[in-house]
């Protein structure tokens, strides 16, 4: 890769994808980002699951509102440094972890995204196969596992979706912006039509906003509301950590905050209500409760409706996979060797890796996925805490943008050999606590709060160590 370096920038730290870029996005682009993230098969199943906790519908809505408002606050906090400097998350991490130490959080985040990218692609392809078999039942002979644990039909579905996602990604960030701008609204249109059809077939009297047979009350209900709130925050922890990769393109923080307001509390509550109407109505209409939207669509007695519904939800999956699991690892892997790995190359590394991990085998082995992803996820909370404490409390919201690309020993973010060991020292124990909460049986009741615990401990450890070791803070820098 040959490109002209800005003065003082190191080729080991800079390429055009990682450096500051023109900021053209407005609030609607951020709103569309969150629509693409929420409007997915996973989002549909998650929203429905909250109404099956045994809580009254108003209690679920309180939990949804509390959780999503916390997510909105975190998203605003995470967005600011990247919007201020116009650089992605792994570059912002250089402030806290050092210009080379930032590869630690970048690689961790990249590995999580690769695993989820493969799993999401596999789940969407499985749903697509349901629709294919609806129209071509004779192809059932090709649905038996054959190569590497996947059937011929499974390979066809997986590689088809894999290729579509890679094509959208390869066309560049501007094309991705245009894609997510219409993908979210398309899914909404299908959801509203599907909800209307379900209500028409079932009758409004048969629609219930409680999807569980059990009913909680008193302190038991209060505790479950707190758990539901924590689940909402945990569900959005991945895309929220990635959010700086998108807020960097925004013109102002006002655009970011406005987009977050419409995309998170307003959009998520509306999506959740429509979801529970559809799921509740499947019981009287089909005789069983269906939590998968594509399975619901495939039962409709109209071929055109099935095709349009399947198209909408496959589009939704492509949208969430690109914004949550494709763009971010592209930046993460490019950050490791900017002079050799472009953003596109980083994305394709993630895409190819997602095939080699055979996500269908990973997903079909709950123990393996539990150990692999939960251990990696234990890092997410502490990474939030360290980054936010560093930017807001240690650096006082000041960034030396040029120093983010300076690998000289005198560089502001060079620290000790390019690594700020204070951040590493804070990350390790906070992560170990998260792993302990996840895997030690006696601590299992705290598992739903692992993100909060990790975030608090990571930030607290870093603040104490940074103050003690007197990590130097920037003086006269770019402020926003």
Model regions and ranges:
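Hydrophobic, membrane-embedded alpha-helices of multi-pass small-molecule transporters
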Residues: 27-44, 157-164, 195-202, 213-276, ...
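Juxtamembrane transmembrane-helix boundary signature
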Residues: 63-97, 109-112, 116-122, 278-282, ...
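Hydrophobic alpha-helical segments and their helix-loop junctions in multi-pass secondary transporters
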Residues: 121, 125-134, 186-213, 235-236, ...
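Selective recognition of specific alpha-helical transmembrane segments in multi-pass small-molecule
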Residues: 42, 66-74, 108-120, 185-200, ...
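Membrane-interface "cap" regions at the ends of multi-pass membrane proteins
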Residues: 1-57, 72, 191-201, 216-229, ...
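Transmembrane alpha-helical segments of multi-pass small-molecule transport proteins
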Residues: 133-170, 185-194, 225-243, 266, ...
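C-terminal membrane-solvent junction of multi-pass transporters and transport-like membrane proteins
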Residues: 17, 21, 383-464, 468, ...
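Membrane-interface loop-to-helix entry segments
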Residues: 108, 119, 125, 156-198, ...
């Amino acid at each position: 890769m040959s490109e002209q370096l800005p003065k003082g920038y190191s080729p080991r730290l800079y390429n055009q994808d990682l450096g500051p870029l023109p900021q053209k996005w407005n609030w609607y682009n951020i709103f569309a980002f969150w629509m693409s993230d929420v409007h997915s098969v996973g989002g549909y199943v998650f929203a429905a699951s909250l109404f099956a906790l045994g809580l009254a519908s108003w209690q679920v809505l309180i939990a949804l509102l509390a959780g999503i408002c916390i997510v909105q606050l975190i998203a605003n906090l995470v967005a600011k440094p990247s919007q201020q400097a116009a650089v992605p998350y792994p570059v912002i991490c250089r402030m806290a972890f050092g210009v080379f130490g930032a590869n630690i959080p970048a690689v961790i985040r990249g590995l999580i995204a690769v695993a989820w990218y493969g799993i999401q692609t596999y789940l969407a392809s499985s749903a697509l196969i349901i629709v294919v078999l609806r129209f071509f039942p004779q192809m059932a002979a090709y649905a038996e596992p054959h190569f590497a644990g996947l059937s011929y039909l499974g390979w066809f579905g997986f590689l088809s979706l894999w290729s579509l996602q890679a094509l959208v990604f390869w066309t560049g960030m501007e094309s991705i912006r245009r894609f997510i701008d219409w993908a979210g609204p398309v899914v909404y249109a299908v959801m509203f039509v599907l909800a209307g059809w379900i209500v028409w077939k079932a009758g409004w009297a048969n629609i219930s906003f409680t999807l569980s047979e059990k009913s909680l009350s008193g302190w038991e209900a209060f505790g479950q509301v707190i758990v539901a709130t924590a689940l909402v925050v945990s569900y959005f922890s991945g895309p929220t950590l990635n959010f700086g990769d998108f807020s960097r393109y925004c013109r102002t923080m006002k655009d970011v905050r406005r987009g977050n307001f419409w995309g998170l509390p307003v959009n998520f509550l509306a999506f959740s209500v429509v979801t529970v109407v559809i799921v509740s109505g499947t019981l009287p209409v089909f005789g069983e409760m269906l939590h998968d939207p594509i399975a619901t669509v495939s039962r409709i007695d109209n071929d055109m409706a099935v095709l349009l519904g399947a198209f909408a939800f496959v589009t939704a999956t492509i949208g969430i996979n690109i914004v949550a699991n494709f763009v971010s690892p592209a930046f993460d892997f490019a950050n490791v060797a900017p002079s050799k790995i472009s953003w596109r190359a980083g994305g394709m590394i993630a895409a190819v890796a997602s095939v080699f991990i055979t996500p269908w085998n990973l997903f079909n082995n709950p123990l393996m996925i539990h150990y692999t992803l939960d251990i990696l996820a234990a890092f997410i909370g502490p990474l939030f805490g360290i980054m936010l404490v560093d930017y807001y409390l240690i650096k006082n919201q000041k960034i030396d943008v040029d120093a983010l690309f300076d690998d000289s020993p005198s560089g502001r973010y060079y620290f000790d050999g390019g690594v700020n060991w204070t951040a590493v020292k804070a990350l390790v124990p906070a992560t170990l606590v998260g792993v302990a909460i996840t895997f030690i049986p006696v601590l299992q009741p705290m598992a739903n709060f692992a993100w909060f615990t990790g975030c608090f401990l990571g930030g607290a450890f870093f603040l104490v160590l940074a103050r003690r070791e007197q990590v130097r803070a920037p003086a006269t820098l770019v402020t926003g």
